[in-house]
């Protein structure tokens, strides 16, 4: 779809499969672009001098992306790039808005707007195996403005994806000693 000499990466499909958001350095910094899934000229959505990475579509017309813009002292938790915030921007462009000061990675959004994601409590090499510590990632559900922790294993739980009925989700976990795929119902303490 892209033939530019720039570095294009991190493609994310829109829910209706008509658009793809991606990261590109074709204008200098790593910005968010959107392109029709059938091809064509991409539209630049962000113009910050920092790096932005698309993580999901909030709906067919808005892209969620991570960036360390640190908007105000009141809304920032940590003062470096380790814990980026989540922003939302229209696929038509315009001014981005702060979506979350929490670092939300691997976001999966249900049709009703509920969000599954894994957290980031501290720095840990994402490729490290058998990591068990207080900063290991956990799966969370954001629903109606409330947050509910979905996993409690002391090791890595990450990359949640809704099932087709959106009553449960798949995720990666090392609870049996190596990364495997598990299925869990929402707000349940047991896997399948």
Residue ranges and their predicted role:
Residues 2-8, 23-33, 46-53, 61-87, ...:
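A flexible loop/linker signature enriched in serine peptidases of the S9 family
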Residues 16-18, 60-62, 112-114, 165-167:
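Short coil/turn segments that connect the beta-strands within blades of beta-propeller domains
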Residues 142-144:
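A structural motif corresponding to the C-terminal end of an alpha-helix
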Residues 190-192:
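Solvent-exposed beta-strand/loop surfaces of large extracellular or lumenal domains
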